[in-house]
Amino acid sequence: MKNKPLFIAIMAVVLASSVYAQAPTIELVHVQGGEFLMGCTEKHSDCSVNEAPAHPVKLNGYYIAKYEVTQELWMFVMGGKNPSKIIGDSLPVTRVSWYDVTTFVSKLNQLTGKKYRLPTEAEWEYAARGGNHSKNYKYSGSNDLEEVAWFRNNSDDEPHTVGTKKPNELGIYDMSGNVYEWCSDGFDFYEWNSSEPLENPTGYNLSETKVYRGGCMTSYPDVCRVSARNQSIPNAQFNYVGFRLAMDENPE
């Protein structure tokens, strides 16, 4: 067969398209680029040291997932393997390390031909605040945590189906509570003291720890604030940490 390599290549594309057609839906929300004050301001009494100083940040536009990555999507991409302790297709996947997530994203991109990634910490916070539609809530979407989050007061210490609480100003769910979410950044303390905005920051790449954000089902309210920060070594797996996807506005 003279055109056997071409035939194989075409079949590979067809099969990949077929597999992608069966994949669980990934809904993305467009976040318009803009400038915001990142970190905890003096008007809040429950700031942690690692949230200060508040500093101006300017971001390009991007996309971020409406929901946390579910166990259904994880198993589809990873061949049926589910690391989560509490099982349910529509529950957020947990017990995934930062390294596990990078493997998942690579496989997902191979399956779909797209360029998904983790959000940066700045992108995560800007989206959690509601982007350029922000109403400056303490939590993502409300000053009343019960409205928008599963946390220690209402969760029975278990993760819940994604998207069952009220969304924030951009229509994004669960950015406060349910499960923490890995970001792409290495952790570092804020040291930006200029009045000029820091543009598209990506964190400290040489850091031994990675950032995760948002609070979880066992968290106290202060940890679910949009400015609250956490960190861990990238090979750590927790029952309360998952992630959500992001994508450049114009992926090349």
Predicted regions and their residues:
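Bulky hydrophobic/aromatic "packing anchor" residues in well-ordered structure
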Residues: 31, 36-38, 64, 93, ...
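Surface-exposed recognition segments
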Residues: 44-57, 132-133, 155-158, 175-252
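Bacterial N-terminal signal peptides
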Residues: 8-16
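GGW-centered surface loops in extracellular recognition modules
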Residues: 22-32
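Bacterial N-terminal signal peptides that target proteins for export
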Residues: 1-8
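Short aromatic-cysteine micro-motif
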Residues: 23-24, 48-132, 153-173
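Chymotrypsin/trypsin-fold serine protease catalytic domain
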Residues: 136-160
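Short, solvent-exposed loop/turn elements at domain surfaces
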Residues: 36-47, 71-73, 84-85, 219-226
